[in-house]
Amino acid sequence: MTKENLLQHLQECCDRLFGCSLEMATEKQVYRAVCVAVRELLEDDRRAFVEQTRAEQRKQVYYMSMEFLVGTSLRNNLYNMGLLEPAGEILHDLGFSLESLCALEPDAGLGNGGLGRLASCYMDAATGLNYPVTGFSIRYEFGIFRQKIVDGWQMEFPDNWLEMGDVWLHTRKDDAVEVRFGGQVHEWMDGDKFKTAQTGYQSVIAVPHDLYISGYGSKAVNKLTLWSASMPQSFDMNAFSRGDYVRALEQNTMAEAISKVLYPADNHINGKRLRLRQQYLLVSSSLQSILNEHLKNYHTLDNLADKVAVHINDTHPALCVPELMRLLVDEHDYSWERAWEITCATLSYTNHTVMAEALERWPVDLFREQLPRIYAICQEINRRLMEKLHCVYPNDPGKWEYMAAVTNSEVRMANLCLACCHKINGVSQLHTEILEKTIFRDYYNLDHSRFLNITNGIAYRRWLCQSNPALTGYLQSLIGDGFLNDANALEALLQYRDDPDVLENLQAIKRKNKVRLAAYIAKHNGVNVDPDSIFDVQVKRLHEYKRQLLNVLHILTLYNDIKDHPEKPVYPQTFIFAAKASAGYYLAKQIISLIVAVSNLVNSDPQVQNKLKVVFIEDYKVSLAEIIIPAADLSEQISVAGKEASGTSNMKLMINGAVTLGTLDGANVEIRERVDDENMFLFGMTADEVQALWQRGYDPRQFLTPELDRVLQMLTSGVLGQRFDDVAASLLTPRFGAADSYMTVADFASYKAAKAHAVEVYQDRTRFAKMSLTNIARAGIFSSDRSVEQYAREIWDL
């Protein structure tokens, strides 16, 4: 599209939306006009892409995920469509700035952490690769939450992202579907046919909203279909007429609650009930939509598995298994055997965790109350599974119990997927190995052919090309544009590893990004940080296994060392944290509070503040990550070995030239294979060593050094302005389960040594610049293009 055509389209949109010209419009009106114009261009390309795929009868992929961490869309779409430059020029001519317009756009409140960001990276990659993939999720009215730190404590506020973000959504009320909760199920035989009916249920209407996804240099356009919930009849006139005004609105309010917030706190029964309703709304409405579309094109479901692949992203959409069975058996009159054959061949499952508490299990009473027919189907799946297992593993009730889908008064979501899906994958080599050897071992031994590894990847055009334009431009000047289409072309950078001018220029670009982040920190945190200090970055959701606690305890040892030896030279370091803790996760919120308390202590101490700075940046999200990641020198990837499935922040930081400081966990293992030990800082036990220590009997007190003991006493003495008894207790006593469940104490000495080594190496600026260059050059394998091509070839059969 030419600049003139784009300007004309923008003028038409502004006139249609606001009845005025672009010259007369306010900045917000121009923002909306530009977004609508881009969306309409995507709609045109979408129609052409759909017509093409239908004509070719291409297999469709449907990616089910509870979250998609999309970030902002305006810059991403303009970049992918090749319109970034002409749009910027048009806006400049009108007296506006593309930067200021992009700043008006909120991050879409559709995700939280790595799971949702991975799903979004895969949608971007699939579109760029011309694969027809539709993502399904929920249109959360208030997202996860907006994080504010108030008196050192995380507070959660509604994230009203739709106020400015709704401009990207295309609502299709005519395609709404009904989802049923509760009631009773009646079963009978009609001749030789099994029949059921659900009565006394609550009906919820799911309305689809489409968000279009562009791909770099591609005319393909895919979409996220996001469901919102409401009642069929939103207003009870009879109740209102009786003066019962609250009841008149109550039912609709209860229905709408389903799509209000991502991951409502589930440390109480109402939260659990709401989460289950969310998951079923997502699955039922999506599968109904998929089958309706398929029947429109093929007039039969016999070929469903040949033309449709439904992918379950973690256990949240695991109800796809019984719901697809319900639709095939109850609604479309398939026999159980034929329906099971279709279901198994259609569904695939990615596991994202080895942590038992994250493998969802629902109490039978709650499950049966909300989803009576689905519960009956789960029981039948389990009955047939047990028949099979009794034959395969006779006289082994332990295996039957471990592999059951329904047992011990709970419905196990992961086992439903394992019992059914034709392909099951882990997301890093180590993670998949752990699945096959431990938690999924019995299913793996039953059928090796269903299991495979596909290591995660990132949409590097967003995380490098858009987030770090200075570095991207410099790389283009050195190695050409090939890496824009093929990330592996970054390896050509290695030829400059010993070029002093290139190393100096890379350092200068890094410093500019650090200056930009320092300005953000000064504005939002009121803390002045030195861009010539080491920017040591840990950005990811807050969880004990990710060990932000290990990082902050080490900072306190550095603080104590400076106080004890003020004359000792110390290279300045800035420690940067950003993370959200789940609303109901008390200990994680305590750790955030500890980080904030340590930052207050360190940053206010005149003896220390020119040597150490600690910053917690609130409300971590994609657009904030795009500022932090290009500025990082050190990438903290310090989970206890064997707990992180893969991680993707390690990849984003790597491709921007940060050097990994981490354990051999998740994708760190594969980063090491790419860059070797001399280009990262490794510490800690391996996954096998962690397991061996648990088996021997781990007592954290045996690993407690005097300096760490001193720090833990600081946590309970009040020297930080408050006491952190629960945090200290979690490391030394079994009050919260096993003492030090994630071996923070055991790995502390090794971590401290690795950090000291990293600081020493950083001061050799040439050596560190070579390490940084090597990481950039070797990061191409972690492109989501590679991951999605593997999914397409090895799972979806595209």
PLM region spans:
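A conserved ligand/cofactor-binding region detector
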Residues: 1-798
